[in-house]
């Protein structure tokens, strides 16, 4: 998808997002649904991902926080032990702070109501913590409120990253 329309305006993919993640199952559904409309480039991407279980897309010059965010989703999807550890950290967040996260996610257009999905996004935003982004995405959250969780989850992420990304 090179260009898409949102709210009456047209965007190129990476002018709107630095990164995105999805499962191979989602890609397969997309390929079947739009088979007759796929561009040559889209067909090549689908072919290249055929042996993957999880796909991450990143802008070449995207933010480091986005890279960490997207890889945290991949680690959570592909490594049960990693997911268990990061979800334990997320679930230790006090309700008042969690509500601030959920409010921010909802404000960004995330679907709210499934605690597991919310945990997944919260862990990814903790891993990809960027204070400037937080002021925009989570204006109700103060840096000192989130610091211990950023540190704890950052340790788990760094260990996994060192095992996987060389």
Language-model segments: residues:
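Short pre-active-site segment immediately N-terminal to the catalytic Zn-binding motif
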Residues: 53-68
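Short acidic alpha-helical/loop segments enriched in Asp/Glu that coordinate divalent cations
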Residues: 81-91
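A metal-dependent hydrolase signature that marks the N-terminal structural subdomain at the beginning
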Residues: 1-53, 159, 163-166
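Short catalytic/ligand-binding loop motif for oxyanion handling, primarily in non-cytosolic enzymes
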Residues: 75, 83-85, 134-135
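Residues that cap or delimit alpha-helices
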Residues: 21, 39, 80-81, 94-95
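Metalloprotease/metallohydrolase-associated module, dominated by Zn2+-dependent proteases
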Residues: 48-54, 91-166
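Short, flexible loop/turn elements at secondary-structure junctions
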Residues: 59-62, 72, 80, 131
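Active-site recognition of the HExxH zinc-binding catalytic motif
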Residues: 65-78, 124
